[in-house]
Amino acid sequence: VAGEGQISSFQALMSAIASTVGMGNIAGVAIAITVGGPGAIFWMWVSAVVGMSTKFFEGALAIMYKGHDSAGEPQGGTMYIILHGLGERWKPFAYFFAVVGLIGTLCVMQANQLVESVTTVLTTPAGIENTLGLRFVMGIVISLVVGAVISGGIRRISVISAKIVPVMVTCYMLLVFVILCLNFDKLPGVLASIFQSAFSLEAGIGGILGTALTGARRAAYVNEAGVGTASMMHGASRNDNPIREGLVAMIGPAIDSGLVCTLTAFPILIA
């Protein structure tokens, strides 16, 4: 159903996934397995299911309580949900979320991991010294590319995300499937280790809780369910049906924490 907005529901979903699928799905999963063991993956799945319900309310409320920016364009987000849903007396919390959200969405970790990956895969094998100047140049390049995208506003971000994200996820899936096919005989052992570690009686209640907390924390960090960032994208959707937009938003954690993180975990456990 067409309504007031700037982008389609699909573009909103792809933009939300674009902000979550990335370095966290690789480095975050590796950290979760290192700290919590293979069982952390099971609790990431559980957290993904819980995150889907949270994302439903984010998407639905973003459509129910839209606002307009200074240019008169329809916008959505947690700040508008607080302002229009809870009332004027909660307005300070809307400002608080806007400021904290701006700080929390800084891409410091992602940029650092991207530079580390480039230097490890490309520059170091080529004999290029990993200096501060090289990292600075890479940072400038990343800033220019990102700046070229976000300068076009939410419309350009959504259009580019809708084109890149499906290709990115599909290519990642195909590469992982190749690894899994080459190591098919090890998959039963990997699955067994995940469930055994998740409910290991040898580790005791403390060990199970530690594994569960590690998996849940990493999943929440990766899919951003409940953080409030996805509502900004879904609030800009032209869809005027809150329930339908909420159902679309639920796909995000399923792809992010459910699919991509699992595809990352299996090769790590096989190795």
Give the ranges of each region predicted by the language model.
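Inter-helical loop and helix-membrane interface segments of multi-pass membrane transporters/permeases
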Residues: 1-3, 34-35, 60-102, 107-139, ...
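Membrane-interface "cap" regions at the ends of multi-pass membrane proteins
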Residues: 1-26, 88, 238-240
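Helix-loop junctions at the membrane interface of multi-pass solute transporters
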Residues: 29-36, 62-67, 180, 219-224, ...
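Extracellular loop-to-transmembrane helix junctions
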Residues: 34-71, 261
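Extracellular/periplasmic helix-exit of transmembrane alpha-helices
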Residues: 58-65, 70, 176-193, 204-206, ...
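Small-residue-rich segments of transmembrane alpha-helices in multi-pass membrane proteins
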Residues: 74-81, 165-178, 253, 257-261
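Hydrophobic, small-residue-rich membrane helices and short re-entrant helix-turn-helix hairpins
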Residues: 78, 149-166, 186-192, 223-255
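Membrane-interface loop-to-helix entry segments
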Residues: 115-118, 134-182, 187, 191-195
